[in-house]
Each structure stands twice: as C-alpha cells, then as structure tokens.
C-alpha cells in the first residue's frame, strides 16, 4: 500500500513521542547512578556506578591543549602528555636524588649548546660539536638512573588495559581501565603522576615526537595540507598551530619549558576525572580525598587573549605535491560553549 509523505512523517513523529518516556527513564536511571564530587582543591570527580563486570575505567580530562601554547613552544602540550608516562620521584628511577642532579647537568649542557647554536653571527662548528658531545654525555649519565617504562609496567602487571592519552586543541586526555579491586592502585598512580611528574628522558622523548611529526605531517600529503589549511583558517588564534608543533619549536624547547607548562595548566581545579564501572561512590570518595587531596590548589589557566579577526573573504590554500589529488573544505563555527 502506498503511503503519503505526510502520513509517514506523522507515523514517525508519533513513534518518537512514544519513545520519549523510555528515553526519559533511561536518563533518569543514568543520573541516579552518577555522583559528582568536588575536592577542596577544585578537582572534580564524576563517578558512574555500573555494576556488572568487575572492571573500572578512568578518564582524566585536563582543560589545556595546544591552544594554550604560544609562539616558540608549539607542541609542548603534546610533549607533556608524553612526559606524564615517565614516572615520578618514586616511580621510574633507581636513585632519584642522583638522577635529579644529573638532569640539572643535562639542562645546563643543553642550554650551553643551544646558545652557541643560536648565535646571531653563526656558531663556531668546533665548539658546537664539543658542546653537543657534552650534552649527549650528560644525557647518558641521567639515563643510567632511569627504570624504563616502570609506570606502565605497574599498570600492566595489575591487569590494566587501554593505557593511553591524546592531546587536542582545547584539552588533554588520559585513560585506562583496571580490575575493580585495583582502584586504590589507580588513585595512587594517577595522583602521583600529576603531583610529582618528572620530565626524565625529555630530550630523548623530544626526538621521538620529532620523528612522529616527520611521519604524520612532513611525509604525508594530507598532513601537510591540513597544517597549511589550519594556518590559513586561523591567522591569529592558536587554533592555527599544529598540535604536534612546528619542527623548529620541537628542536628548541627545553625541559624547563615543560615544567612551566605543567605548573601553569595542570592545577587540580583545571581537571575533571571520570570513573565508571563496578564502584560505589560512597566507598571510594574517602580514597579520592586521601590521594588526590594532596594536589595543591592553584590558579585557573590564564584565559586566551587572542580573538580571531572576522574573516572577510574566502581563503584558499593550494599545495602542489606529487601525490593523488586531495580536497578539503572547512568552515568556522561558533564555539561549543556559545549560547
């Protein structure tokens, strides 16, 4: 039997109305299992009780990403994400007191090398080579105290899965899952890595990120096109920066820059942690207070100052490349928080 468009639309509309109570019930059921808890230091927890499999998933949201970078340190938000897996003063080291002194020597050697490299009149090749050797030797001494991958191996041995992180323009995300009886282990590890992160093997990891850029951007036509497109779309706002950073910045920023980024943006009032799985909120809140209450409160991240000027004409990017043709089209839209 043939139905008119109006009758079909009416039937669909009635079906949607009939489904509304079910949707409302599902939402009410979800909200009944959700607990929001805020610590005195500003850190907010969202706890979703989902009985069933004895597994709990954890998601840490940090309200800072590549948009919080400034010229000269692009890629630093992503770089710190890598550093957050390197351990603490207690995890990832065989002798932290000695390692800390060795890292200070690495910093001093790097800055001496960097100053010579940047001389406006040109570097002395022989002196630069000697300074680079000294920097390399200092890194080798610091590396001798490192217990590699200890943070992730603790999680693996405890049955953890999905350990990972990602950095976007507006936020950085950390996540993994553990058996439900390992919640206290998670609370210790997660609070410890944001209470006392150690930027060990910084320059070695910086080399890893530089190689990541070569693979994802420099050697990929789509990567090169997207980078140019974003730069054209945002001529003033840091959304125009590549999240992975410009190569010249990756070659130049220092361990102290990463520490400063952490100090500025990783205060607990700039973070939200979601916990979902076989948990009871009232049972774990004291645990959260005990471990995460150690994080000192700090000021909120500085707001972005730069406002993107109004676009008054179409912007076109053409990128000649010996590859298959690629086409991309983008439109500016209001922020997700816009009323």
Task: Give the residues covered by each predicted segment.
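Active-site recognition of the HExxH zinc-binding catalytic motif
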Residues: 74-82, 86
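Bacterial N-terminal signal peptides
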Residues: 9-19
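N-terminal secretory signal peptides that target proteins for export/translocation
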Residues: 1-4
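Short amphipathic alpha-helices in soluble, non-transmembrane regions
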Residues: 188-192, 286-291
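Non-catalytic beta-strand/loop surface segments
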Residues: 23-68, 92-181, 215-270, 281, ...
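M16/insulysin-pitrilysin zinc metalloprotease superfamily fold
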Residues: 87-89, 176-205
């Amino acid at each position: 039997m043939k139905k008119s468009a109006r009758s079909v639309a009416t039937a669909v509309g009635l079906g949607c109305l009939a489904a509304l109570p079910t949707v409302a019930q599902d939402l009410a059921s979800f909200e009944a299992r959700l607990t929001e808890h805020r610590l005195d230091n500003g850190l907010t927890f969202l706890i979703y009780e989902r009985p069933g499999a004895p597994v709990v998933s954890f998601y840490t949201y940090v309200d800072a990403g590549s948009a919080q970078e400034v010229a000269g340190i692009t890629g630093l938000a992503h770089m710190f994400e890598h550093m957050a897996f390197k351990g603490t003063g207690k995890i990832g080291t065989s002798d932290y007191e000695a390692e800390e002194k060795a890292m200070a020597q690495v910093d001093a050697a790097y800055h001496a090398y960097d100053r010579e490299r940047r001389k406006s009149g040109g570097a002395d090749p022989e002196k630069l080579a000697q300074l680079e050797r000294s920097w390399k030797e200092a890194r080798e001494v610091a590396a001798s105290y490192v217990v590699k991958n200890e943070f992730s191996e603790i999680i693996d041995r405890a049955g953890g899965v999905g350990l990972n992180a990602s950095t976007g323009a507006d936020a950085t995300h950390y996540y993994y899952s553990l058996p439900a009886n390992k919640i206290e282990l998670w609370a210790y590890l997660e609070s410890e890595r944001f209470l006392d992160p150690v930027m060990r093997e910084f320059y070695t990891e910086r080399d890893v990120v530089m190689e990541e850029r070569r693979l994802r951007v420099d050697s990929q036509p789509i990567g090169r096109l997207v980078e140019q497109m974003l730069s054209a779309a945002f001529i003033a706002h840091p959304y125009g920066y590549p999240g992975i950073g410009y190569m010249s910045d990756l070659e130049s920023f220092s361990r102290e820059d990463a520490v400063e980024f952490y100090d500025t943006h990783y205060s607990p009032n700039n973070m939200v942690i979601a916990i979902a799985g076989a948990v009871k909120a009232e049972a774990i809140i004291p645990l959260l207070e005990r471990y995460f209450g150690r994080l000192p409160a700090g000021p909120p991240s500085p707001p972005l100052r730069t406002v993107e000027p109004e676009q008054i004409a179409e912007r076109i990017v053409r990128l000649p490349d010996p590859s298959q043709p690629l086409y991309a089209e983008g439109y500016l839209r209001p922020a997700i928080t816009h009323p």
